[in-house]
Amino acid sequence: MENEIKGFMDYLAGEKGASKNTQLSYERDINQLKKYLEEKGITDVTRVTRTVLNSYVLYLEKEGRATTTISRMLASIKAFFHYEFREGVIKKDPAELLKAPKIEKKTPVILSVDEVNRLLAQPEGKTPKEIRDKAMLELLYATGIRVSELIGLKLDDINMNIGFITCRDERKERTVPFGKTAKKAMESYLDSARTILCGDQEQDHLFVNCNGSVMSRQGFWKILKHYGSLAGIEVDITPHTLRHSFAAHLISSGADMHAVQTMLGHSDLATTQMYMGYRQHTSNR
């Protein structure tokens, strides 16, 4: 299957223009299937049947894989076999009718306004690290961007005069405004903390760790957990919790649904509409 997988990866990179992360995800998923098939004595893509793929799904479930993970893996597998069928490598697509396990939609954790205020108040701003932490938390809540977008921001992506950031990936970009509180925290970080944290390193990323390197997702996750604990927040919070809270609080305040959709970068309005329940809940209190 090596040649078939390589051909599919070339197709993703070329014709589809898939991002590096997407390519890596597909390649990882398909190689895991390849390993399973080889253990079953199947090395030829033409020998893969729907029964074999169904057995693979059962295997993943027994391994304790999350339904969301299995669904993602199956999406990669379906795309691969559809490509092989389209190219005439196989006469029948064994993944065409393959069904992913049903995913239970979990209600997102949304902090109250009071909880958010307590969280944002934790970094006292006495050290360069605390000044940076304050800026990251304020900007994340003020914009609702993803943590990957936050740590991916570069100096050129922020306009302090007008008050907006530009989030980019390989295929699209969007601008998101931020308010006075976040602007003040950002000014403090840029004026008095970032240079100290960078030290001798030249760094074009906006947020850096204490060694002057790019802040990692895990690094920010630890920062958030630390301040969440100090704030006495009992629910398990993640960087996405602030994104959920940003959206829910905006909508509960009467913000336009389409405007919130644009700021969040949701391609489907239905994804943004899930926060309507929070508005109805708060209006009844």
Q: What are these regions, as identified by a protein language model?
A:
Residues 1-285:
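Conserved catalytic core of the tyrosine transesterase superfamily
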